[in-house]
C-alpha cells in the first residue's frame, strides 16, 4: 500500500480547533514536511487548493498558498517522492494547466501529476466573478470531462482541436510535452464523480470514515471497483485519514478529546452552510461528509487515534480492503507526526515490510 502526505497548504492543517496547533502555511514548513516524508520513503505528496476559508476564531483556511507554485518549489528540493498539485478547474484554462504540468514534470524529472477538482464552495469563485451559476453543481462533471480531454490531447500529442460545449481549441499547442505519462487523480464519491474517475482518472481519492473504524470506507472502495469495471480500467482508491498517535492509546485519545473540546463552532457553521448550497448532486458528495457533525472538527476524514502499534495495525486493516491502493495521511502535528510514522509506525506495518527501517535525519 502506498503512503502519501496531504501537505498543509492552508493554515492549521485539517483541525478546526482552538486547541490544535496554530500555524501559517509557508514554503519552509511544507519543504520540511515533504523532505521528511521522502526520507521515510513516503510515495507521494499532494496539496489541495483553497481560495477562501471558513473564518471563525481560528480563521480556518483563510490563509493558503497556491498549489502549482508550491509543488513546483517542492519538486525542486526533492528527488524521489511523487508530487501532485491540484487544479481549480474553474479558474485555470486546461491549456495553461497542461503547460504548467509539463514544466513541473521537467523540474521533477517525471515525478509530477495533477489532481482535478470541479469546485464546490461558491464563495471561492464568486469573489472573483468566476462562479458560473448554481446549475454548475449538476453539470460540473460534464465540464470536467471536456477539461481532461483537452489535457490528454495536449500531453499526448502536443496539439488539440477539441470542440465542446465548454472549451474550443483551435490548433492549440503545448511543447515540450511531459517526459512521462501524466497521472490524473480525482476525489469523487458521488456517482457522477466515480463515473468520471472510472473513465478518466488514474486514482480516486475518498474519505476514510469514523474514528478507529479503518475499514468503514470499504463500500466506497467497492463502488469504485464497480464503476471501473464498466470502463474496463483499473482505478484504485486512495483513502484519506488523520493520524493522531502517541506512546499509548490513552495518551492519543486524550489529545483527540482535547482537540474536539476546542472546536471552532463559527468556522464549522460556515462549512455546514456551504455544504447545503449544492442541492443538485445528491447526498453522497465529499462536502456532505465533511460537514457531518459526528467529527466535524477534522472535516470528518477517517481518524486513527492510538498508540504507534495500534495505528500500524489499523493501517494494515486499511490495506486489506479490496480496491485500496494507498492512503493519504494528515497529522495533528505534521513534523512530529511524520517522524513518529517513519520511526515508530511504519516499521510495524505488514503492508510496508518492504521498506527498510530508517532513523531520523541528522540536522
From Swiss-Prot:
Per the UniProt entry, what are the Gene Ontology biological process annotations, in alphabetical order? alkanesulfonate catabolic process; nitrogen utilization; uracil catabolic process
UniProt GO MF annotations: alkanesulfonate monooxygenase activity; uracil oxygenase activity
Which Enzyme Commission number(s) are listed? 1.14.99.46
SUPFAM superfamilies the UniProt entry points to: Bacterial luciferase-like
CDD domains xref list: Alkanesulfonate_monoxygenase
Question: What is the reaction catalyzed?
Answer: uracil + FMNH2 + NADH + O2 = (Z)-3-ureidoacrylate + FMN + NAD(+) + H2O + H(+); thymine + FMNH2 + NADH + O2 = (Z)-2-methylureidoacrylate + FMN + NAD(+) + H2O + H(+)
Keywords carried by this UniProt record: Flavoprotein, FMN, Monooxygenase, NADP, Oxidoreductase
Q: Does the keyword Nucleus apply?
A: no
- Short name of one Pfam family: Bac_luciferase
| Residues holding FMN | 49-50, 115, 124, 140-141, 190
Q: Which InterPro entries match?
A: Luciferase-like_dom (IPR011251), Luciferase-like_sf (IPR036661), Pyrimidine_monooxygenase_RutA (IPR019914), SsuD_RutA_monooxygenase (IPR050172)
Q: What does this protein do?
A: The FMN-N(5)-oxide reacts spontaneously with NADH to produce FMN. Requires the flavin reductase RutF to regenerate FMN in vivo.
- Record's family? Belongs to the NtaA/SnaA/DszA monooxygenase family. RutA subfamily.
- Protein name as annotated: Pyrimidine monooxygenase RutA
Per the UniProt entry, what species is this protein from, by scientific name? Klebsiella pneumoniae (strain 342)
